[in-house]
């Protein structure tokens, strides 16, 4: 299986673009729970967002254009994530004032650095990966999805081109990164949201990798750098929706 989209081949990886759009859609569904509606069940489809973003990072790192043609630090990729990690924190805090963790971008950034250290084995990327691991260990309580979430892109890199059942390994990390004690406790007495969340965490890596191995027969809008802005802007949009609903 080849998930690469190197510059010397025409076209884009439509499956990867579709995966990113589905991850965005899942994220927005999850955050609709905070606008004032009684839609707690949206927590279940929301479990697909983070693993699919991590899978997209793994695919980008595994492309021949990154890993073979130019085996060096992906400074531009890191820079965009770092910039939007900072830009997103204010709208994130405005929308989720009681949040005890940072927005998801720092988790994805650290995960990218660690996965890159494995994928592109040179002294610079290795040192950066070790620093990222140290920062994760120190500040994991402030990171969304914790240590397991930071390691998820690396786990996807390791299983990306293996048989589909290997997707169970990132599924374990997906469960560990979520509130698994509460989910399993809820599932033990039959809570449908808890049961659905566990199923979603297990299925997300499997479905994501299966999608990437398919070839969509329809056009997909390319997810280019402008798409980074969706993350902070969707918080502001949902904040506005909550304000309108609060006046009704």
Residue ranges of predicted features:
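Alpha-helical transmembrane segments and their immediate juxtamembrane cytosolic regions
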Residues: 1-248
């Amino acid at each position: 299986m080849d998930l690469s989209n190197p510059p010397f081949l025409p076209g884009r990886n439509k499956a990867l673009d579709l995966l990113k759009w589905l991850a965005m859609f899942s994220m927005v569904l999850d955050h609709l729970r905070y606008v004032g509606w009684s839609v707690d069940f949206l927590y279940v489809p929301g479990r697909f967002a983070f693993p699919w973003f991590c899978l997209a990072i793994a695919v980008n790192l595994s492309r021949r254009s990154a890993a073979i043609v130019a085996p060096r630090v992906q400074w531009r990729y890191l820079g965009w994530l770092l910039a939007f990690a900072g830009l997103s924190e204010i709208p994130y805090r405005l929308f989720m004032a009681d949040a005890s963790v940072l927005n998801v971008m720092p988790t994805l950034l650290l995960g990218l650095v660690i996965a890159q250290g494995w994928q592109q084995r040179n002294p610079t990327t290795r040192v950066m990966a070790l620093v990222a691991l140290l920062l994760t260990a120190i500040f994991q309580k402030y990171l969304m999805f914790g240590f397991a979430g930071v390691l998820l892109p690396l786990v996807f890199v390791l299983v990306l081109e293996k048989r589909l059942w290997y997707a169970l390994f990132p599924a374990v990390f997906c469960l560990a990164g979520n509130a698994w004690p509460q989910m399993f406790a809820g599932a033990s007495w039959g809570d449908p949201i808890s049961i659905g969340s566990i199923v979603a965490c297990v299925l997300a890596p499997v479905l994501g990798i299966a999608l990437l191995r398919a070839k969509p027969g329809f056009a997909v809008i390319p997810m280019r750098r402008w798409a980074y802005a969706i993350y902070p802007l969707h918080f502001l949009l949902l904040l506005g929706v909550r304000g309108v609903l609060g006046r009704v």
